[in-house]
Amino acid sequence: MTTPPVLSLALPSDTGRVLSIQSHTVQGYVGNKSAVFPLQLLGYDVDPINSVQFSNHTGYPTFKGQVLNGQQLCDLIEGLEANDLLFYTHVLTGYIGSVSFLDTILEVINKLRSVNPNLTYVCDPVMGDEGKLYVPEELVHVYREKVVPLASMLTPNQFEAEKLTGLRINSEEDGREACAILHAAGPSKVVITSITIGGILLLIGSHQKEKGLKPEQFKILIHKIPAYFTGTGDLMTALLLGWSNKYPDNLDKAAELAVSTLQALLRRTLDDYKRAGYDPTSSSLEIRLIQSQEDIRNPKVELKAERYS
């Protein structure tokens, strides 16, 4: 009896086949739970590898679960390779907690690029936020020296962009310069997903279409929502992957669509917690992903990108 073909390989879609290596929680939406479903709604075949499997995210009083190590990741990749299943158009990575696991992911990227040289690697370099690291310091060096050169698109927040470039971002010009520094190191697309300057929240995006050329840069002013949510960075990076692949020459349009989805989802989440009688400012909130399917598929763009000259 012959093995039937994998239809996502035999009949590839016009979107792509994504390998997403991120965390997983049984309850709630962070990591792969935030990324896989939206990408599937946008038409992608997504194969998740769960770097951890926890009962819930670590913001709860307790959590239980397992952590995947580098050898176990290699075992999964070897299983795919043995069955000729290693052709992917995209790899997506998020939170990674150890140098050894990150080094193994780099080996995986190189192996996948040997199968598909046009592989797009989208990396959310999750290291910390608001001036605080929540990964070991040695990971910063690995991201800067090894990961950034391999990435096709990078989606740091303000703090992470500062750690990767050594540049303090105190103005829009600093944000644009940080993007240029990152372009010089590797990725053609950089989106600093959240920057706070003078109390104003914005996103700065940059697309260098050819090495040596001046990048096309833009900003989107973002409405602050008075609450803290989990899983939003994972969702944002997945949406940027999804829309930037559909609009490869218009990163600003991709960012508009991603931001619009996220804003609508966060407003719904906030409203639903209020309807349930819960004070949404008292702790981090689980996002209403399933209830926001239409906003993922067909976002209404309310916040427009403004291109820098």
UniProtKB/Swiss-Prot annotation:
Pyridoxal 5'-phosphate binds at T58, G233, D234. ATP binds at D124, N157, Q158, F159, E160, T193, S194, I225, P226, A227, T232. GO terms for biological process: hyperosmotic salinity response; pyridoxal 5'-phosphate salvage; pyridoxine biosynthetic process; trichoblast differentiation. Keywords: Acetylation, ATP-binding, Kinase, Magnesium, Metal-binding, Nucleotide-binding, Pyridoxal phosphate, Sodium, Transferase, Zinc. Optimum pH is 6.0. Active from pH 4.5 to 10.5. It catalyses: pyridoxal + ATP = pyridoxal 5'-phosphate + ADP + H(+). This is Pyridoxal kinase. One of its GO terms (molecular function) is metal ion binding. Catalyzes the transfer of a phosphate group from ATP to the 5-hydroxylmethyl group of pyridoxal to form the biologically active pyridoxal phosphate, an active form of vitamin B6. Required for Na(+) and K(+) homeostasis and for salt tolerance. Involved in root hair development, both for initiation and tip growth. The modification N-acetylthreonine is found at T2. Divalent metal cations. Zn(2+) >> Co(2+) > Mg(2+) > Mn(2+) > Ca(2+). Pyridoxal binds at S23, T58. Its EC number is 2.7.1.35. The active site is at D234 (proton acceptor).
